[in-house]
Each structure stands twice: as structure tokens, then as C-alpha cells.
């Protein structure tokens, strides 16, 4: 009975930690212009060639148990005509925050239809699974002996199906997309006393404005919505030169100022780096976050076939 009481206390403590990171059940990404497929399955096959993305985010440097995220994705086309495209892809993602962790894998399909104005409208769906982990051994126990009891210190793991859906529209210079992530909203009562994961709505939009001498201005925004929490908004302004280098700044609502740098290495690789300067109260313990994203594309960027919306990537 004593062990059960301590176990429940550990769960209550972990639930408090879980509530602190609820807003990040869907990871926040500063380089969202480079991770459209990760955030919206309808963008699978946007490029007419194999496209691989990898990324890592280390948040709140110096804060014990701070969130970290890594992902990899591969997408492409399986069939296309002048009026329609069938895109497919796969995604894997690992997210850690204190004693909590998730690993997700999904396969996606997107259908794209060319509109009369020359733009493309896409709808997409992904199906996969997500594994939730609770490492009880990493929690602090009031009873030292109980911490070494296998019945108390063992980790908990649960696996659930997950479904994402999205819509995406892009023209030559602008795009807009909206997606629902974690439509299944799994119940975690076996781990955390009647806690349910949340459905997330992610909306992203951007445009591109040509300037003089091969310069281009690319403003964009991403909004993340989840029931019971304030809306999170990122606003980004990038200036690109000759599709080779981009620098810019961003703002995340009441949370961070962001510095951006993107470099095209050769014609097939793009590397993006973002540095978040914390402006919320947590900056007193951890003021910064780092994020690196790598894009590997089989398309030669200077090929006409590779051209797509200039507002992202």
C-alpha cells in the first residue's frame, strides 16, 4: 500500500510537469518554413523529386528536463500529370520533456489539383502511431528506499494510433496551409490520472516579394491552437539573396525573439539555423534555444522542374 501511495504521488508530480509542457505536445519549430511536411501532411510531394528533411531542437539551454526534439522525413511523388499530383511520404519524430517522451511514426498521402489560376490545392492524410513514455525513475521520491523498488521505478509506455490531416494551397509567390495534428486525441489515464492528449490546429502562411539585385523579402507566420491554452503565434521576416543565403528575425508571442540563418550548400543541400532569445519569465533560468534543420533534395535548385513557391524553403 505504501508503494502504491508513493507511485500515485509520483504520477501526480509527473502530471504537473506534463501540464507545463502541454503546449508542446506538438513541438514548436522556429524553422517552420523548412519543415512544412512535418507540420502539414498536405505538403507531401510539393517538390517533384525526393526530398529529405532532418532537424534537431534543443530548447531552454541550461534548464533541467528542458524539451528537445528531433525528426526526419522523406517525401516525393508517385504519379503526376499537368493537372494533378499524388504525393507520399513518411515521418519520424522523437520528443523529450523531463520524464516524458514520445516517439511517433506516420505514413502520408496527399492529392494535389491544379487550379484555374495556376496555383495548386492539396489535401493530405497521414496514419501512424505514437508511443508515450513516462520515466518514473527520473522523478524525485520522498522515500529513498521506494525509489529503488522495481514496482515504483519502472517506466510506463503506451502506444496509440494517430491521424493527421491538412489542406495546402500555393501559388508562385504565396502559400497558406492548415492542419489538424493528433486528431485521435489519445487517453493517457493508465499513465497520468485521466489526462488526454490534445488535438492541435496549425496554420501557416507566407509570401515572397522580389526586390532589386536578386534580393527577395519573405514574410511569414505560423499559428498554433490547442483547446484551453493561449494561441501561439510566430511571425518571421527573411531576406534572401539569389536563393543562396537568407537571414532574418522572428517573434514568438510572449516567448522569444528569433534570429534566422539559411545557407544553400551546392545545389542539393540547405541548412537552416535558428537561435531563440527567451523573453518570458523562464529566461531567468534558461534564456536560449538552438535549432538546426537540414534539407536534402534530389532536385537541382536551378532546374526549371524544381521551381515551386518561392515563399518557403
Regions found by a protein language model. Name each.
Residues 1-6, 115-117:
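Positively charged n-region of N-terminal signal peptides that target proteins for export
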Residues 24-313:
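Subset of outer-membrane beta-barrel
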Residues 7-16:
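Bacterial N-terminal signal peptides
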Residues 18-23:
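Sec/Tat signal peptide C-region and signal peptidase I cleavage site
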Amino acid at each position: 500500500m505504501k508503494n502504491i501511495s508513493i507511485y500515485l504521488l509520483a504520477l501526480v508530480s509527473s502530471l504537473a510537469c506534463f501540464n507545463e509542457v502541454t503546449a508542446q505536445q506538438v513541438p514548436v519549430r522556429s524553422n517552420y518554413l523548412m519543415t512544412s511536411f512535418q507540420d502539414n501532411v498536405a505538403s507531401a510531394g510539393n517538390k517533384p523529386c525526393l526530398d529529405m528533411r532532418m532537424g534537431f531542437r534543443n530548447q531552454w539551454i541550461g534548464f533541467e528536463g528542458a524539451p528537445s526534439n528531433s525528426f526526419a522525413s522523406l517525401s516525393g511523388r508517385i504519379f503526376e500529370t499537368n493537372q494533378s499530383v499524388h504525393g507520399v511520404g513518411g515521418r519520424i519524430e522523437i520528443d523529450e520533456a523531463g520524464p516524458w517522451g514520445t516517439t511517433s511514426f506516420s505514413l502520408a498521402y496527399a492529392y494535389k489539383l491544379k487550379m484555374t489560376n495556376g496555383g495548386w490545392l492539396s489535401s493530405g492524410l497521414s496514419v501512424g502511431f505514437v508511443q508515450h513514455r513516462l520515466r518514473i525513475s527520473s522523478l524525485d521520491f520522498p522515500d529513498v528506499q521506494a525509489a529503488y523498488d522495481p514496482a515504483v521505478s519502472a517506466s510506463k509506455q503506451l502506444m496509440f494510433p494517430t491521424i493527421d490531416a491538412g489542406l495546402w494551397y500555393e501559388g508562385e509567390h504565396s502559400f497558406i496551409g492548415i492542419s489538424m495534428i493528433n486528431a485521435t486525441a489519445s487517453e493517457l489515464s493508465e499513465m497520468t490520472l485521466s489526462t488526454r492528449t490534445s488535438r492541435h490546429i496549425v496554420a501557416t502562411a507566407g509570401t515572397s516579394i522580389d526586390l532589386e539585385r536578386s534580393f527577395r523579402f519573405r514574410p511569414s507566420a505560423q499559428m498554433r491552437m490547442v483547446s484551453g491554452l493561449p494561441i501561439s503565434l510566430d511571425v518571421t521576416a527573411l531576406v534572401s539573396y539569389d536563393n543562396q543565403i537568407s537571414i532574418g528575425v522572428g517573434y514568438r508571442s510572449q516567448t522569444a525573439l528569433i534570429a534566422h540563418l539559411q545557407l544553400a550548400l551546392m545545389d542539393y543541400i540547405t541548412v537552416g539555423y535558428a537561435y531563440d532569445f527567451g523573453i518570458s519569465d523562464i529566461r531567468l533560468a534558461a534564456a536560449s534555444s538552438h535549432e538546426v534543420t537540414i534539407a536534402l533534395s534530389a532536385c537541382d535548385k536551378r532546374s526549371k522542374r524544381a521551381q515551386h513557391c518561392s515563399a518557403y524553403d
